[in-house]
Amino acid sequence: MDLHSLLELGTKPTAPHVRNKKVILFDTNHQVSICNQIIDAINSGIDLGDLLEGGLLTLCVEHYYNSDKDKFNTSPIAKYLRDAGYEFDVIKNADATRFLDVIPNEPHYSPLILALKTLESTESQRGRIGLFLSFCSLFLPKLVVGDRASIEKALRQVTVHQEQGIVTYPNHWLTTGHMKVIFGILRSSFILKFVLIHQGVNLVTGHDAYDSIISNSVGQTRFSGLLIVKTVLEFILQKTDSGVTLHPLVRTSKVKNEVASFKQALSNLARHGEYAPFARVLNLSGINNLEHGLYPQLSAIALGVATAHGSTLAGVNVGEQYQQLREAAHDAEVKLQRRHEHQEIQAIAEDDEERKILEQFHLQKTEITHSQTLAVLSQKREKLARLAAEIENNIVEDQGFKQSQNRVSQSFLNDPTPVEVTVQARPVNRPTALPPPVDDKIEHESTEDSSSSSSFVDLNDPFALLNEDEDTLDDSVMIPSTTSREFQGIPESPGQSQDLDNSQGKQEDESTNPIKKQFLRYQELPPVQEDDESEYTTDSQESIDQPGSDNEQGVDLPPPPLYTQEKRQDPIQHPAASSQDPFGSIGDVNGDILEPIRSPSSPSAPQEDTRAREAYELSPDFTNYEDNQQNWPQRVVTKKGRTFLYPNDLLQTSPPESLVTALVEEYQNPVSAKELQADWPDMSFDERRHVAMNL
């Protein structure tokens, strides 16, 4: 026995087994009415249970074979499904006019029968069957990515078809609740996916508008979820007149081993024939042997080479340890391209002038392609950032989905109990600028982390916009590790990272959610969306009166610095745009915290309370300071006897009057208040503190 064959044991079936599944088909003399009622039941959110596959297959047989069971039984579709373990059980009831009449009278169908009794169906058009099947096909291209991506893609296609005047779908079909129902059905129904794909590929005549939509959707579904197959075949296993040659970058021995394993996996995939490009959608056997993680170096090199050729396939992550390999492959491929172009130009050009013209053209072409690639990637990055923000803002989306589903469902489906959605804490290896994903995160896209804004990305770096995992956000996001360590003895509070909301109840809920506290303890400060009073604008009197409030929980640390490049004119929302903030970025906060001390009515001014008004001596380094019993903000006495309100005075978009006066008077070369105000936003919080404490 070859000992090395041990490595391959268990990768191939030795006793193949196919699980038998029974599918019920319905046969009546009023097939169109039955099919329309099946569509109505699905649209109403009724769970057909084990009758769902049979109902969907009944729709397909009616649409493609006009309910001719003999034609269907001799078709390639029926043969493939039988080989896959499906057995067809036909229920005949010639006089039945309602879907209710053909359902077997068995106890476990009782809830379904009760639900269908309340369903009123007035539609009896045959074209509605094709309309429904074409609508289902719109979800195929992004089916393996996730619900949001699939629904967005379907809506874009609906818009295109409506503009072209091909077909118009009912408005209630385009609601989020209904589209999620269809997505779930398509995700779970192998028969519907298979029939749509088979007919989309093989239907060559008799097309109507619905069939053309199905064919178009199936064409877009090719190699969905098989990006590594497409990139390796196009860029690594290069097909030439003399045969298949390996790309120069993968000719080293270790990568060659991965290429050999990949070829073996491809040969297994090819056994599925015309269904191989749809293997991920149909979940065919052998698909698990084509994951990126099984071929890390090959995958990284293939994606780097593809990007160098102008491909915008940037949504795929490679392992963090192989990210540099991807960048190196990109750079090497760009140089190889230039070298090949130079050699071709030398052979083609007849004189020096023509050679210069051709070289200049190819150089411009390369630059244009590169800039266009970066532009597309920038759009993808912004879209991903918006998507992540939407996930955070709609953290109870499941409850909203249930409500929207109830709008299209009948009264018997109304369920007043809300759905609880918890925030999953994930292992944190690095700071991220996105809020934590919710439980129903998009399967493939939610792993592709993004920075909070593409404005922090170096556009000269071709991978700055590619790498969903690898962005270094040191300028825009930072865990309070180095700077906050200077505040010795100040306990880190999970409350400091909580979102601020208009509802006090939501504040309490977020501050008491242990999972979210655990996650946010290590994450950067998420942006504040509402123009509301923050935890830090609460006056000290209120904090003393309510020692158990979440305001006191949130003031264990001084608030993170808040300053922008623009002067603040009024207390409306404005973004916090400094990228040098050691505490991380924070969003909009009520303007009261930025008011100077001279305003006696400012809520942030300390009340007439001895505990809050006592002068507290601070050393410039804050090394021995502990504030376990104190409330923020506080009066601080500097070295030279001046007082200012810490940290409020250091958070303003312009310097407080006391510091301006001191700096103008005491500097050897006095600066004007206007000049100081212009420089103030660019100073870090540490620099502001140092200036203030030495005045």
From Swiss-Prot:
Organism field: Lake Victoria marburgvirus (strain Ozolin-75) (MARV)
Keyword Transmembrane helix: no
Gene Ontology cellular-component terms listed: helical viral capsid; host cell cytoplasm; ribonucleoprotein complex; viral nucleocapsid
Similarity comment text for this entry: Belongs to the filoviruses nucleoprotein family.
Keywords carried by this UniProt record: Capsid protein, Coiled coil, Helical capsid protein, Host cytoplasm, Host-virus interaction, Phosphoprotein, Ribonucleoprotein, RNA-binding, Viral budding, Viral budding via the host ESCRT complexes, Viral nucleoprotein, Viral release from host cell, Virion
Region named Disordered: 424-458, 483-615
Maturation and modification: Phosphorylated.
Record's subcellular location: Virion; Host cytoplasm
GO MF term list: RNA binding
Coiled-coil ranges from the UniProt annotation: 316-341, 372-399
Sequence motif: PTAP/PSAP motif, positions: 603-606
Oligomeric form and interacting partners: Homooligomer. Homomultimerizes to form the nucleocapsid. Binds to viral genomic RNA. Interacts with VP35 and VP30 to form the nucleocapsid. Also interacts with VP24 and VP40.
Gene Ontology terms: biological process: viral budding via host ESCRT complex; viral RNA genome packaging
Notes on the domains: This protein can be divided into a hydrophobic N-terminal half, and a hydrophilic and highly acidic C-terminal half.
Residue stretches of biased makeup (Polar residues): 494-505, 537-552
Free-text function comment from the UniProt entry: Encapsidates the genome, protecting it from nucleases. The encapsidated genomic RNA is termed the nucleocapsid and serves as template for transcription and replication. During replication, encapsidation by NP is coupled to RNA synthesis and all replicative products are resistant to nucleases.
Record bears the keyword RNA-binding: yes
Identification of the protein by name: Nucleoprotein
Biased composition (Basic and acidic residues): 438-447
